[in-house]
Curated annotation (Swiss-Prot):
Listed name of the protein: Putative defense protein 3
Secretion signal, residue range per the UniProt entry: 1-18
Family label: Belongs to the insect defense protein family.
Chief site of localization: secreted
Domain Reelin: 19-163
Entry keyword Transferase: no
Organism, as annotated: Antheraea mylitta (Tasar silkworm)
Lineage of the organism: Eukaryota, Metazoa, Ecdysozoa, Arthropoda, Hexapoda
CDD domains to which the protein is assigned, alphabetical: Reeler
Cited Gene3D superfamilies: Reeler domain
Length: 163
C-alpha cells in the first residue's frame, strides 16, 4: 500500500514538472527540459532545414523542423540560433503551436505554446544587422515526457556582411 502511494506521488511530481505551455527561460543555457529522464542519443529522428546555407546580416530565413517519418511527432520544442555558446538573432512564429521566449534578449528563442502533436513546424529567423559568421540552429525536441533529444544541431548557415 505504501509503495503504491509513493509511486502515485512520484508520478504526480513528474507530470507537474513538465512544461505543456512552453519551456521556461531557466532552460535557455542547457536546453534540457528538466524531465526526470535521460535524453535520447543523437542522431534524432528529426531534421532542421533551411532553404539556403548562406545569407546576409539583417536578412531573414525560414527554419523548418520536421520528423523523418509520420510517426516522428513531437509535443515540445526549444529552438535557438547560436554562434558558439551565444544565442543570436530574433525569431518570428507563424502558428498557434509556438511562442517566443526571452533567453537573455527578447524573441531570441522559440518554444511550444501547447502540447499538441506536430510533425512539422517552421519559423522565421532574422540575423542581427551587425552579425557576420556561422550560426547553427539548435533544437531540443520532446516527443513525450520521457522521450526527448537535447540540442539537435542543424548544418551551419553562414551570415555575410550586408554591405
Amino acid at each position: 500500500m505504501m509503495f503504491a502511494y509513493i509511486v502515485a506521488v512520484v508520478s504526480a511530481l513528474a507530470l507537474t514538472s513538465a512544461y505543456p505551455t512552453g519551456a521556461p527561460s531557466s532552460t535557455c543555457v542547457s536546453m534540457r527540459p528538466g524531465h526526470l529522464a535521460d535524453p535520447q542519443p543523437l542522431p534524432a529522428p528529426y531534421t532542421i532545414s533551411t532553404p539556403v546555407n548562406t545569407m546576409k546580416a539583417g536578412d531573414s530565413i525560414e527554419v523548418t523542423i520536421s520528423g523523418n517519418t509520420p510517426d516522428d511527432f513531437f509535443r515540445g520544442i526549444l529552438l535557438q540560433a547560436r554562434q558558439g555558446d551565444n544565442i543570436v538573432g530574433k525569431w518570428t512564429v507563424k502558428d498557434d503551436f509556438s511562442k517566443l521566449l526571452d533567453c537573455g534578449e527578447p524573441d531570441n528563442a522559440v518554444t511550444h505554446a501547447n502540447s499538441v502533436d506536430k510533425t512539422t513546424v517552421s519559423y522565421i529567423w532574422t540575423a542581427p544587422e551587425d552579425f557576420v559568421g556561422d550560426v547553427v540552429f539548435l533544437v531540443t525536441i520532446v516527443k513525450v515526457y520521457e522521450t526527448f533529444w537535447v540540442a539537435i544541431p542543424s548544418a551551419p548557415v553562414t551570415v555575410l556582411s550586408h554591405k
